[in-house]
Amino acid sequence: MAIDVPEFIKNNAQRGLDYLADGFGGDGLTEGTKRAAREMAAGNISEDKVRKMAPWFARHKADGQAPQNKDSSDPGYPGAGLVAWLLWGGNANFDDAAQDWAQRQIDNLNNEKDRKSVV
């Protein structure tokens, strides 16, 4: 099943990649995360990535409370948490839009698998 990546996720992933190119981001960023962000920015996403997104956002939501991740006047802005959030397709304000989108896709994927298993 092809998954259409919304513009806001494409744009956020690209913004995260731009920050990364400018030297921002933490040491914990994996090559897999960077590769997936490049794919999302280009409008492509794997089922595996979508399935990882909703739980990842749930685990990292609190990162948005750190000053370096939410206050553009903070000397540490943009913090590693913000850069990672963007690379995963999330909005800079740490809202639930990308998490909600990912959960809808997961639900759709699960429903499709259920339909196929009945046939």
Predicted regions and their residues:
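Conserved small-residue motifs centered on glycine
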Residues: 1-115
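Conserved small/polar residues in nucleotide/adenosyl-binding loops
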Residues: 118-119
